[in-house]
Structures are given as structure tokens and as C-alpha cells.
């Protein structure tokens, strides 16, 4: 089930999945339904819902969710008459069994995510999704960490397993527009014409929209965004602002801009217990090239051990830590605290 309208950009909302990170995975069902209803009425193409770290991400390592994935998925599915219900799956966290449960709960699209050098672990999940008849896209996360040519090699693997779309995923919000252009163009040249390319950006260097536009102009046909930028770190490309920019550029999205503005201000911003914005901590994520969902974990560790969040993030970047290594955040904080005590 690939993108139905080949003449229109595919708008994938991630407010209820990436936005989970901003709320420590605590969306209640009433808010979930209200946001999904508003997005569906605004005519976005797809709405992603699951724990921030994907199916079965509710763990000690990543943070426990307010509900299980099936409850969230069913709540969104009940509100959608237009948008496709989408889930995220990271091999090693979620399983094929979890994907089948998500399908039973109402999901009809999945993004299978791996680190940018580990596409080979995605095969069974991609094949299972295709067997279920799901729209099957993939993420190559932390895409800033390898050159475009190496990223294209990984994308070809995902394509060979059955991926219908491969996303250039800037998990750290570290890429510049020219970096996005190079990666999308390289993938476009490497993949079959029918294999689509998507862009998933973060706003840590305030480039979420600029990078999305650069990716679209380079050949991407799917784009992720979230209401009020609700997502990990400084958030994703703000959906309402992105649609305004695309409207100005004459790019058809089919979305109701004012309805998205209203949903961002009336439904999403009031939920934020920590503002989703570019500040000294979230800016440090993009500058150091650190996985955006590390932010709140690093802030907790900084408070516990009396060190600067920026120092933790900088050291994580120096050590080239990636998603799944959240346990190392405390180790880094302890190392910094010990070094600080030694010179006191």
C-alpha cells in the first residue's frame, strides 16, 4: 500500500509518536483522541502513534508509557476517516509479534527504523509488514553520522527487503540544508524510481523546516512534521509552519492550514511541561550530533549528579553514542561529576 496520490506530497504527522518524548510518553487517551481528530479533519495523510521509541518501547530504559501501544493505536484509529494510522518499530525493541498486534489494533502503515549503518537487522520486520499489506517505510536514523554514499548502500538493502519508502532521518537535528540535499539526491540516484524517499527532521539548529524543504526539492515525496514541533529535543519541523511555507512555494499538501494552527495552539502547546524549543540544551543536541530523545534523560542525570546538561550532551557526542544507549547517559554524568570533584 504505497502513497495513493503520486501527484501530491505525503504529509506524515508525528505529534503523537515523536511528541511522546516531549511528555515522557504520557499522552492520555482523551488528548490522543482530540489531537488525532483535529489532524484527520485537517486532512493530513497519516498520523503516527506509539511509544516514542516505537512499539513496546515502554521499558525502564526508555521510560514507561501512560498506556500500552494497542490502546493508543485503537484510540487514534477510532478518530480517523481520512488519515492512515501509522506506527514506528525499532528492531530490537519491537518485534514482528508486536507489529501484528498493532495491525489488529488499527495500524495500516509502519516505519521500520534502524541506525544508519544497521539496515540488515530490518529484513524480517519489513517482510512481515509487506505480508500484512501495510504501507512499509523505513528510517535510517542518525543520518548525519555517515556520508551520503554509505547511506545509499544501507537504503538499497532496505529496498531489497521490500521497503516502499526510505527516510533520511536526522535524529540529532545536526544536518544542514546542503547535507540534506546531498543525501536525498544520492538516495534518489541509487534507488529504483518507484521507491520513495522521505525526510524526518529535527529543529535543534532551527533548521527543521529548511531541511525538510531542501529534502523535498531534492526529490523526497514524504515529509514528517508535528503540531507545534512537538517532538524530541527542540522538536520536529512544526507542521503548521511547514504547511504555510509549502503553500507559499505552491506545493500541494491538501491540508487545512488554519485547522493545524488551531490544533497546535489549543491542543498541543498546553500539554508541554517543558517548552519544546531551541534553548541551550536542545541546541547542544544539534551542535554535538546527539540523538534528540536523549535530552530529558540528560537533564535528569544533570540534576541528579550536579553537572551541566550541555557537558553531558557534548561528551555523548564525542563518544558517538546512538539511540539505544540511553543507559550510558548516567555513566557519562558520573564520569563528569567525578572529574569535577577531583579538581574542586
Curated annotation (Swiss-Prot):
- Pfam families the record matches: DmpG_comm (PF07836), HMGL-like (PF00682)
Residues covered by the Pyruvate carboxyltransferase domain:
9-261
**Positions annotated to bind substrate:** 17-18, 171, 200, 291
Identify a single GO molecular function assigned to this protein: manganese ion binding
- Enzyme class label: lyase
Q: Where is the active site?
A: 21 (proton acceptor)
Q: Which InterPro entries match?
A: 2-IPM_HCS-like, 4OH_2_O-val_aldolase, Aldolase_TIM, DmpG_comm, DRE_TIM_HOA, PYR_CT
Site note Transition state stabilizer, residues: 17
Q: What is its EC number?
A: 4.1.3.39
Reaction(s) this enzyme catalyzes, per UniProt? (S)-4-hydroxy-2-oxopentanoate = acetaldehyde + pyruvate
Task: Give UniProt keywords alphabetically.
Answer: Aromatic hydrocarbons catabolism, Lyase, Manganese, Metal-binding
Keyword Metal-binding attached? yes
Cited HAMAP family: HOA (MF_01656)
Q: Return the protein name.
A: 4-hydroxy-2-oxovalerate aldolase
The organism encoding this protein is Xanthobacter autotrophicus (strain ATCC BAA-1158 / Py2)
Amino acid at each position: 500500500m504505497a502513497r495513493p496520490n503520486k501527484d501530491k506530497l505525503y504529509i506524515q504527522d508525528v505529534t503523537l509518536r515523536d511528541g511522546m518524548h516531549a511528555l515522557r510518553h504520557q499522552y492520555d487517551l482523551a488528548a490522543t483522541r482530540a489531537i488525532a481528530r483535529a489532524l484527520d479533519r485537517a486532512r493530513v495523510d497519516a498520523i503516527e502513534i506509539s511509544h516514542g521509541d516505537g512499539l513496546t518501547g515502554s521499558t525502564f530504559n526508555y521510560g514507561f508509557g501512560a498506556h500500552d501501544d494497542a490502546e493508543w493505536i485503537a484510540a487514534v484509529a477510532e478518530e480517523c476517516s481520512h488519515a492512515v494510522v501509522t506506527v514506528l518499530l525499532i528492531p530490537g525493541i519491537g518485534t514482528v509479534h508486536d507489529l501484528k498486534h498493532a495491525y489488529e489494533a488499527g495500524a495500516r502503515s509502519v516505519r521500520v527504523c534502524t541506525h544508519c549503518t544497521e539496515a540488515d537487522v530490518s529484513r524480517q520486520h519489513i517482510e512481515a509488514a509487506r505480508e500484512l499489506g501495510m504501507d512499509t517505510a523505513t528510517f535510517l536514523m542518525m543520518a548525519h553520522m555517515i556520508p551520503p554514499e554509505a547511506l545509499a548502500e544501507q537504503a538499497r538493502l532496505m529496498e531489497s527487503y521490500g521497503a516502499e519508502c526510505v527516510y533520511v532521518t536526522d535524529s540529532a537535528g545536526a544536518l544542514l540544508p546542503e547535507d540534506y540535499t546531498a543525501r536525498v539526491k544520492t538516495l534518489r540516484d541509487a534507488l529504483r524510481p518507484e521507491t520513495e524517499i522521505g525526510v524526518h527532521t529535527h529543529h535543534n539548529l532551527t533548521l527543521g523546516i529548511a531541511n525538510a524543504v531542501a529534502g523535498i526539492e531534492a526529490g523526497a515525496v514524504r515529509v514528517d512534521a508535528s503540531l507545534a514541533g512537538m517532538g524530541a529535543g527542540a522538536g520536529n519541523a512544526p507542521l503548521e509552519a511547514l504547511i504555510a511555507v509549502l503553500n507559499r512555494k505552491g506545493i500541494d499538501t491538501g491540508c487545512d492550514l488554519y485547522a493545524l494552527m488551531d490544533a497546535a495552539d489549543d491542543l498541543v502547546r498546553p500539554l508541554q511541561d517543558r517548552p519544546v524549543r531551541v534553548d541551550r540544551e536542545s541546541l547542544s543536541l544539534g551542535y554535538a550530533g546527539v540523538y534528540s530523545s536523549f535530552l530529558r534523560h540528560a537533564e535528569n542525570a544533570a540534576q541528579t549528579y550536579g553537572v551541566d546538561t550541555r557537558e553531558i550532551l557534548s561528551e555523548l557526542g564525542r563518544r558517538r553514542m546512538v539511540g539505544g544507549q540511553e543507559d550510558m547517559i548516567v555513566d557519562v554524568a558520573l564520569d563528569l561529576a567525578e572529574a569535577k570533584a577531583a579538581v574542586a
